[in-house]
Amino acid sequence: MSKPTAVLFCPGRGSYTKDELGFVGRTLRPGPVTDALNACDDWRRSQNRPLLREIDGAERFRPGLHLDGENAAELIYFGTMAQLEHLRERYQIVAVAGNSLGWYTALPASGALDPTSGWRLVATMAALQKQVKGGQLLTTVVDEDWQPNAQLQVAVMAVLDALQDRGADTFCDYSIRLGGHEVLAGTEAAMTELLTHLPKVKVGDREFPFRLAGHGPFHTKLCTAVSEQATQMLADLPMRAPACHLIDGFGNVHSPWSADPQELLRYTTTQQVLETFDFSACVRTAMREFQPDVLLCAGPGGSLRAPVGHCVLREGWRGLHDKQALFGSGLVVTD
C-alpha cells in the first residue's frame, strides 16, 4: 500500500513551548541528526554554554533559557529534524517548505544541506540576529471562523503606513504573512506604537496583538548588517540541489533537477533575511503545484496548523470553506 503524499512545513520561532519540553530527546534516533546534535553539544561545551540535550531534558520549562534566541532556534531545528525521520515512514514527502526559521530546517529536510551544516546555518543566523534591536508582534486579520476580515486588514495597513510616514525611528513592516495572521516587525519605538494603535481582537482564548518574546525585526531591512555578515560567514556552506522540491519564502519552487545551489545560498543570506517572508504563498504553492494528500505541519508543537488551515479556507481547496469542515477533512495534519 502506497504512502499518502505530503508537503512538509517546518515551524519557526515560538514552536518549542513548555508542552514540548523533552521533544528532541523523545524523538531522536541514531543517525546523521544525532551526529549533528553531538557536534552542536561539543561546540557548546567548548564555549562553556549549556548543552542542548540538557536544555531539552530540563525538569521544568524556563522562559529565560528555553526562549533565548540561540537555544530556541536549535531546539526547534533538532526537534523538526528528529521528527522528520518518523514522518518519512508514514508519508511520501514530495515537497518541503518552512516558516521563517523553518526555511533553514527545510534546506536539510529537503536534502539541500546535510544535518550538521543545517545546524551551523541555524546557529550562525540565531547568533547574528540577537545583535539587532527591535522586535516582532503577532496580530490577526481573520475572525473566529477563520474567515478574512477586510476591516481588520485595512486597519492594520493604515497603522503601518502612518508609522512608516513618520520616519526611521518608527520603521515597521510586514515580517511574515502567516495565513490569517500577520507578523509585523520594526524598531522598539514602532513596537510600542503598534501595540497601542492596532485593533484589539480576541479569537478564541487569544488576544491580539501581542509581542513575540525574544524575537528581533526579522525579514526587514533592519537586518541588513546580519545579511552582510551571514553572506561572509556562510560563504562555504555546502549547499547542493535538494532531493525533493523546496518552496521558498516567495512561494517559488526549487526542484531537484533545476535548483541552483549558489542561488539557494544567496537567497538564504540576503532576500530571505531582508524581505517579507510569505508563508501564505508557500502554502498556496503547495496546494496548487503539488496537490498532496495532506499538508503536514511538523513539530515541535502545532503552531503551523492554524495558518495552514487559514490558507486552505481562503483558497477553497478541495471545496473546503469553513473551519469545521476543515477539521473533519484530515487534510492538515501534525503527525
Protein language model regions, located:
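Acyltransferase/transacylase module recognition
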Residues: 2-88, 238-335
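Gly/Ser/Thr-rich loops at beta-strand to alpha-helix junctions
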Residues: 14-15, 103, 188, 216-219, ...
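Short, charge-rich binding segments
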Residues: 85-90, 97-99
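Short active-site oxyanion
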Residues: 92-95, 180-182, 291-295
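Alpha/beta catalytic cores of group-transfer enzymes, especially the acyltransferase/condensing modules
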Residues: 110-260
